[in-house]
Curated annotation (Swiss-Prot):
InterPro entries: Ribosomal_uS11 (IPR001971), Ribosomal_uS11_bac-type (IPR019981), Ribosomal_uS11_CS (IPR018102), Ribosomal_uS11_sf (IPR036967). It comes from Chlorobium luteolum (strain DSM 273 / BCRC 81028 / 2530). Disulfide bonds: none annotated. The gene is rpsK. Part of the 30S ribosomal subunit. Interacts with proteins S7 and S18. Binds to IF-3. Belongs to the universal ribosomal protein uS11 family. The lineage of its organism: Bacteria, Pseudomonadati, Chlorobiota, Chlorobiia, Chlorobiales. This is Small ribosomal subunit protein uS11. HAMAP family: Ribosomal_uS11.
Amino acid sequence: MATVSRKKKKVKVTPEGVVHIKASFNNIMVTITDVQGNTVSWSSAGKNGFRGSKKNTPYASQVTSEGAAKEAYDLGMRHVDVFIKGPGAGRDAAIRALQGAGLEVRSIKDITPLPHNGCRPPKRRRV
């Protein structure tokens, strides 16, 4: 029995928005929301086909940001404020990709959480 495919509901959004970039040591996630915090588009390195150690590369973050930004641009978003969280590689590449996709970056803010000597950190890597 064939299922009826429904068309995805496309909603026009306001021209202003917020980009949340979470760059961990293992992955990068980009979420674009409107000013109220409702998600407009999102993307991650794993969603774009990167696996394993390739997920935390500047190229992966560039592809991830471009995908989310193009989707938001098509829905009508033009100006964004950027919030970056995490120590991962490719933080700068993600912002450059947002600008390359046509979104005007108005402000960049680093909201990486810093402990006031909380939990003991993981042991040092020996590479």
